[in-house]
Every structure is written in C-alpha cells, then in structure tokens.
From Swiss-Prot:
Temperature dependence comment: Optimum temperature is 45 degrees Celsius.
InterPro entries (alphabetical): Nucleotide-diphossugar_trans (IPR029044), UDP-sugar_pyrophosphorylase (IPR039741), UDPGP_fam (IPR002618)
Keyword Cell membrane on entry: no
Role noted for this protein: Required for the synthesis of the intine, the pectocellulosic inner wall of developing pollen. May function as the terminal enzyme of the myo-inositol oxidation (MIO) pathway. May also play a role in the salvage pathway for synthesis of nucleotide sugars. Can use a wide range of substrates including glucose-1-phosphate, galactose-1-phosphate, xylose-1-phosphate, arabinose-1-phosphate and glucuronate-1-phosphate.
Keyword presence, Nucleotidyltransferase: yes
Gene Ontology biological process terms from the UniProt entry: nucleotide-sugar biosynthetic process; pollen development; UDP-alpha-D-glucose metabolic process; UDP-D-galactose metabolic process; UDP-glucuronate metabolic process; UDP-L-arabinose metabolic process
Description of the deletion phenotype: Plants produce collapsed, nonviable pollen grains. Male sterility.
Name of the protein in question: UDP-sugar pyrophosphorylase
C-alpha cells in the first residue's frame, strides 16, 4: 500500500494517484522514476482502480524490463535521449573540434611470408579466444523470411552461415589445441546475440542440427531487449497507438552486445579460465573466417587492445572509414567514421578535396567491416567503468524544418564498433587490412536493390556473396599452384558477376594457407565449368585435372588422394527469376540453381588410404 509520502508525490497525477493501491513498492519506485523524468503523460488516460487492473500491471512489467535491461535504467536512457535530441535539433556535429588522420595498423597481402606467419600465430592464439556472433536480424531486407544465419552460405553444399561459423571455430579449436605444448584441450566459447525476432529460431536451428558438432555447453545465447521509443524532443516515451498500457519499442542496435556480455558474467569466467581475446563478427559475411587467423595473429603480435578488421576502401565508398580523431583539447580516439561524415570532416580540417584515393588507388582510411578483436583484460576493465554502455546516437525523422515534431517515434541506437569511443588515448587501437576478395562479401541486399547498384560498386547480395566464395577459393588454390581457369561473366538477377569454378571445402580441410599448400602438389587444373566440394580433412590433390563435378566426403581416418583426369557432364547453372514464387526463397534470391547432371561422388566411411580417379 502506498504511504502518505507517496500519495503527496503522486497527487499531481490524479489518474495514477487513484491506482497506487494496486502497485507493489517496486512498481511505485518505477512510477516515481517515470514522473521525475517527465513521463506523467503515460498515465493520463488511466481509468480508476478496478478497471483494466491486469493491463496496468502488465504496463509496469514492461517498464521493469525496460529499466533493468538498460545500463543505468530508464532515468539514464531518458537523460541521454534529452541531450542527444537537443543536439540533433540544433544540428550539433558530434565531431566538432576533431581532426582526422590515418591511424596505425597492419596491411596484409594474402600469401606473403608476413601473412603466413600471422596466420600461424593466430592459430596458436585461437584457443585463448571467445567468439561472439551478433545475429539479431531477420532476412527480410534480403527477400528471405528466415533468420539470416540459416541462409545457405553457398548452394553447392547448402551449408548455412551458422554451420560454417561453428565448423570454422571447431577447426581453429582443434588446430590450436594440437599446437599447445601442455596437451590440454580447451573448448572455444561461442556466444550468439539474438533478439525477440531470432532467439527461438536460432535455438531451434542449433538443436535440430545437434549444434553442428559443437558441445551445447560451448554455446551461449544472449537475447537483447528493445528500448523505449520517444515521441518528441522532450524525450517523452511513446505509447502504442493501439494500447495505452504499452510503450512502443524498437531495437537498440548491435552495440547492446557489450552490455549483455558485461551483465552475463561471462567475461569474468573467461579471464579466470585464461582466455585473452574476444572476437566479434556479424551474421552474413561468408568470407570472414578467411581473415580471422591472420588478424588474431596481428592482435597478439602488436598487443592491440582493439583491432578492427578492415578492407581497402575507395574514397567516398559507402562504407565507414577507420580514422584517428584528435580534438583541439588534445584527446584522441581511433574509431569508425561513417562515409557520409568522413568527407565533410576532412574538408573542414584542411583537406580541401576531402576523402580522395592516394597513390595505392584507395582511400588512406581503410574500410570498416564490423569485425573486432578485443583484448579481454582491458575490455572487462573498461566495461566495469561504463557498465557496458556504448556511446549512442539518435536519428529522428522530423516533420519539417522547425525540427519540433517527428514523422514517427524515434529511439536511441548504438553500434558495436563504437566501443573505442570511451577508451583513453593510451589504449592500443589499430586495424588489420586484408584483400576484399579474401575477407569481405556481406549478404544484405535483395535482388531488386542489388540490380540498381551502379556498375562497378559491390552488390552485397546473395548472388554476389556466393560468387565471392567461389572466387576466393579459386584464387587461394591458384596461389597454392593449381591452374584454376579464369571466370566468365554472367548476369544473374540483374547483376553482372564473375562466375568462377564452384570450389568449396570444409574448414577442417584448410583453415590457413600453409595447410592448404601442403594438400596440393604436382600439376593440377580445374576448368571453369567444374564443381569441387571437399568435405573431408585428409584429402590431398595431386596431379588432378578436373572438368566436371567432384564431391568427396571422408571420415578423418581416411586419407584420400584426388588425381588423374576426372571428366563428366558436371553441374550446370540455370537462371532463376527472383519473382518466381515456385522456387524456394533461399534459391530465388540468388538468381540461379544447380542442375546436377552428373558427378563423381565418393563417400569414404572406412579408415585407410584411398585414391579417387575417374
């Protein structure tokens, strides 16, 4: 029951005052927080006690959730919102007073001695790492109704993104444990940040597939909550137009991963277990594990607290640039600056041409691909100071130039890669640049949008993402000495792409270049129309001439040699229209499917030595 003090406090809001008898002491405290922060409008339409009581209690359940899931609670959320909305209204630039310069980092070229050494070092470090996948999104923007991690990475084998990620982590785990001198086995923790949209479907995908070979105890799902929407510049919380007892909510952004890790207690547990690194990555870049061993090697060698994986970036390209920003007061930070902010920032800082390509043909500011490697100790220390909170931003859509009313409610947002914004200048923050063909092929645009992309710019579609995998694998084998025939150009779903030989392999076959080189010898060649899928570990390619389709699946104790001339009718590629609803979504968004006319397929389930020749 509410005390006299409470009654006096709430007397200015009669509709709430008359309902105090319904509320628990905790709920009364939450009501106080709301009133102290300018939210009395939430109760204006409340009827007297005895009417809709269940709905009123449900309202406070939601308020309790919103309060507990945000660092500092709703009071902190509303305070930050008021500040950011005031800045937005006057057009304040968050980078005022800052000058950009190129930070220090490591540029790696695939196949060089330095690259190979960094890969080897990265494998050694892998058992000291935890992997965090940020997977809160559905595939609607792609024209796919499932969760994005369930989408096939490529359709030669049909392996989905999540399976590929898990098998890559397991391959690194095994290789790293083998190298470690004390002979101990350590399981690499794998964390998946989900949302209301993806949580149950991600869990179902894992359980239906026995976690793709990972121990269920290795995998932790952390679900992010949404945040309250804001109706106006006073940061008044927005009610659902169809339910006066419910606050409108929207996703807060992938920056939530830091507060979730902080509150989960996992960071402390990992430190106790001797872990040293936390790797963050996003849900649909099918090439990213090509870059992880070497970038982890760079982190260990350079002792970076923060290492952003990056790719060469053309000036003004629509991808954030990693920049060192130095303020007139002397403080500095190394962060991702969005492309539309980088150019004006440079022009305002004495670079009249803004963001331009240097003698390399690329911008000196490398392109951020949202993959971070953080050193665990300093990361945990920093989160203890911030409670896991990340610098936020707000992006209201105003009705007109007075900037007094919004077209629709807005909310605060945060991004995973903004973590370094709160770090002291002494923090060692760097980057690792790798070839785009090796490391970056995100799948985020639907066929219609991808077809509108200006020629020469990346499509970032399911079509280009799959073709990039075949290109990367073909180029890796070329550098290992295989004569892989050059690609042909083809238009699929309105996008002109290079079609290379359809070559895929399981991560355990070759996680790093030096391992792949050991498995290839003699004179090998693969024609452009060929398909080759290697699903075993101990498969060796020697003097192979492939013109057709070859699928090899073998247990670890089977040693398999692929050689001689293997020629058959192979698999053909058939165009599919993305509007053709008779075709499954995951196929039609690519614009093609395989017609498996003929192949040589070997499944070896017994130990021993085998030779596969036509």
């Amino acid at each position: 029951m509410a005390s006299t003090v409470d009654s006096n406090f709430f007397s200015s809001v009669p509709a709430l005052h008359s309902n105090l008898g319904l509320l628990s002491p905790d709920q009364i405290e939450l009501a106080k927080i709301l009133l102290e922060n300018g939210q009395s409008h939430l109760f204006q339409q409340w009827p007297e006690l005895g009417v809709d009581d269940k709905e009123k209690l449900a309202f406070f359940d939601q308020i309790a959730r919103l309060n507990s899931s945000y660092p500092g609670g709703l009071a902190a959320y509303i305070k930050t919102a008021k500040e950011l909305l005031a800045d937005s209204k006057v057009g304040k630039n968050p980078y005022d007073g800052f000058s950009p310069s190129v930070p220090s980092g490591e540029n790696l070229t695939f196949g060089t001695d330095n690259f190979i050494e960094m890969e080897k070092r990265g494998v050694v470090e892998a058992r000291n790492a935890a992997f965090v996948l940020v997977a809160g999104g559905l595939g609607e923007r792609l024209g796919y109704n499932g969760i994005k991690v369930a989408l096939p990475r490529e359709t030669t084998t049909g392996t989905c993104f999540l399976q590929h990620y898990i098998e890559s982590i397991l391959a690194l785990q095994e290789a790293s444990n083998k190298i470690d001198s004390d002979g101990s086995e350590r399981d690499i923790p794998f964390i998946i940040m989900t949302s209301d949209d993806t949580h149950s479907r991600t869990l179902d995908l894992l359980e239906l597939n026995s976690y793709f070979g990972m121990k269920p105890t290795q995998v932790h799902l952390l679900k992010q909550e949404k945040v309250a929407c804001l109706d106006d510049n006073d940061a008044r919380l927005a009610l659902d137009p169809h339910n006066k007892y419910s606050i409108q909510t929207k996703p807060h952004g992938h920056g939530d991963v830091h507060s979730l890790l902080y509150s989960s207690g996992l960071l402390h547990k990992w430190l106790e277990a001797g872990l040293k690194w936390v790797l963050f990555f996003q849900d649909t870049n099918g090439l990213l594990f090509n870059a992880i061993p070497a970038s982890l090697g760079v982190s260990a060698t350079k002792q970076y607290h923060v290492n952003s994986l990056a790719v060469p970036r053309k000036a003004k390209e629509a991808i954030g640039g990693i920049s060192k920003l130095t303020h007139v007061d002397g403080r500095s930070m190394v962060i991702n600056v969005e492309y539309n902010q980088l150019d004006p920032l440079l022009r305002a800082s004495g670079f009249p041409d803004g963001d331009v390509n240097c003698e390399t043909g690329f911008s000196p500011f490398p392109g951020n691909i949202n993959q971070l490697i953080l050193e665990l100790g300093p990361y945990k220390d920093e989160l203890q100071k911030t409670g896991g909170a990340i610098k936020e931003f707000v992006n209201p859509k105003y009705k007109d130039s007075t900037k007094t009313a919004f077209k629709s409610s807005t909310r605060l947002e945060c991004m995973m890669q903004d973590y370094p914004k709160t770090l002291p200048p002494t923090a060692r923050v760097g980057f690792t640049v790798m070839d785009i063909w090796l490391a970056y092929a995100p799948v985020k645009n639907n066929p219609e949008d991808a077809a509108k992309v200006p020629k020469g710019n990346p499509y970032h579609s399911a079509t280009s993402g799959e073709m990039a995998i075949y290109r990367a694998n073909s180029l890796i084998l070329q550098k290992a000495g295989v004569k892989v025939e050059e690609p042909v150009k083809q238009v699929l779903n309105g996008q002109e792409v290079e079609v290379w030989s359809r070559i895929t392999w399981k991560p355990k076959w070759g996680m790093i270049f030096s391992d792949i080189k050991k498995k290839v010898s003699g004179n090998c060649e693969v024609s452009q129309r060929s398909t080759m899928a290697i699903k075993g570990r101990n498969v060796f390619i020697k003097d192979l001439s492939l013109d057709g389709a070859l699928i090899v699946d073998s247990i670890d104790d089977a040693e398999v040699k692929l050689g001689g001339l293997i020629k058959n009718n192979g698999w053909t590629m058939e165009s599919v229209d993305y509007k053709d609803t008779s075709v499954p979504e995951e196929i039609r968004i690519r614009g093609f499917r395989f017609n498996k006319v003929e192949q040589l397929e070997k499944k070896l389930t017994q130990p021993g030595k085998f030779s596969v020749e036509d």
